[in-house]
Amino acid sequence: MSGDYSATRKSENVDTSTTASQEDSSLAPEQPEKLVGASDVAAVSNNEPTADEYPHGLRLITLVLAINLAMFLASLDQTILGTAIPKITDEFHGLSQVSWYGSAYFMCLGGFQSTWGKVYKYFPLKISFAIAVFVFELGSLICGVARNSNTFIVGRAIAGIGGAGITSGSTVILAFSAEPAKRPTLMSTMGVTYCIAFILGPLIGGAFSEKVTWRWCFYINLPIGGLAMALFFLFFRTPSVSTTQDATLKEKLLHMDPVGTVLAMGGIISFILALQYAGVSHAWNSSVVIGLLVGFVLIMVTLAAWEYFQGDYAMLPYRLFKRRVMWAGGIFQFFFVGCYFLLLFYLPIYFQSIKGVSAIHSGVDNLPLVLSACLFIILGGAAVEKTHMATPYMTAGSAVAAVATGLLYTLDVDTSSGKWIGYQVLVGAGLAFPFQNALNILQAEVDADDMSPATSSLYFFQILGGAFSISAAQAAFNNRLLHSLTINAPGVSPLLVLATGASDLRSVFSADELPGVILSYMDGLKAAFAVSVGLVGMAFLSSLHMVMIDSCETLHTTGDDGAWKGKEVKELEVERLYVN
């Protein structure tokens, strides 16, 4: 069962006071084989809520609705911008800062995941989640009223900080809202929420941008966020095991690891700026670009050293990353999810700039991808729950996605609708089917005390993948676009092309200039799609490593001969998880 995602925890996490009879009872061979996840072991150690504490009936339904409404907003902000970007570039006059519109949000969404994980561990869960929603709403308001690109980017960053608290807190709250055996089903509601946001995001963004104003893409967050908070406060009761850790205020603030957060943000900003400048305003071999890239490497090395010496104070605890399932899962999510967000940004640009369709129409054209993703993320969750296997789907999904993104690379000016519809369906299937699997594996292997930092650490890699991928795609797009213009439209000013919004090409350039500009845009988009192929290829390689991890970490309840192995052997195998 090399792909089984339910591996048992380290032996010292199990209550050693359990009697022999209880051990024999819990490990009785006549029971159906069931590998125990971290949550189950934590329950044995009284680290789980009792059955009576779990919400049921209407209370559970309303609580899940409230949490998923908040998650819907954070997810919608990841998808709604794609079809709105061409209109935003029209108003703010240029493409030069497009990568920041997405990266500012993703950078903070990922960079503050671990910080919020510590907040939920050391401060009251209910109040912390409310603050996260408030910060997100504040950032959305700033984006809505922004009169220039810089203010808009600041608003996106603030919304990202709040969004980090929402995504991290939602997972923790739902984990405390269901018994371990029912968590995959409950967590799948988040997958459905992602899907709904992915479906509605491009449509809402296009509709607001064309019929009203793109600013309503952010104003809409305010009433929905208020409703989510009202329902949450009415129906959520903090479980007894979710007590805040006993520590002084100074110790709690140290656990937030502000130095680590600043280093992470500094490194990400250096990398994004280097890609933004390179080949556009500065040559790749210029001192500015080289200095930023060298600075990025040095900051990342400093961050790694700082996190190591911080111990449990680190935003990325080293003891968690000693386990391959933690860092290998993070690497997989970095590349895999990054590919998806890249496509959500650049496919609408393809439809609006190359095909010349409206913002609403581009959202409709993007539906094959998001509808396919919605369907297959549900099927993927059901497959994991049915088979108790996760990693084989990660490998298969990334392989399918690699082929599908390769097909997207073949898109051209005159590609038929049948092809781009089919390609998107295939991409959605490959990327969505194993979308939640790394999280499923991780949450099955950590106890209740580590649920929050482990989950937020995984989200750190996942969301940063979006920031890095969008920036890398923008760099590839800009460089290829500028090079292609010298061939296809030598009489057109490259600066004018960069300063023109993607949906304004046909109104700015003459009939003689437009074909060359469109061809150059297509070359730039092909470069962006090539980045997506590379990302999902790296995800495929990391998924192979995840399979090897599961092969040696899964604890079989029986030996090769079918005989019961017993507790002593299991303890030895659990110890092996921490020395490999």
From Swiss-Prot:
Biased composition (Polar residues): 14-25
Keyword field contains Transmembrane: yes
SUPFAM superfamilies: MFS general substrate transporter
Keywords per UniProt: Glycoprotein, Membrane, Transmembrane, Transmembrane helix, Transport
Single Gene Ontology MF annotation: transmembrane transporter activity
Residues carrying a glycan: 285
GO CC field: plasma membrane
Coiled coil (residue ranges): none
PROSITE patterns in the record: MFS (PS50850)
Family: Belongs to the major facilitator superfamily.
PANTHER family in the cross-refs: MAJOR FACILITATOR SUPERFAMILY, MAJOR FACILITATOR SUPERFAMILY (MFS) PROFILE DOMAIN-CONTAINING PROTEIN-RELATED
Protein known as: MFS-type transporter thnB
Species of origin: Trichoderma harzianum (Hypocrea lixii)
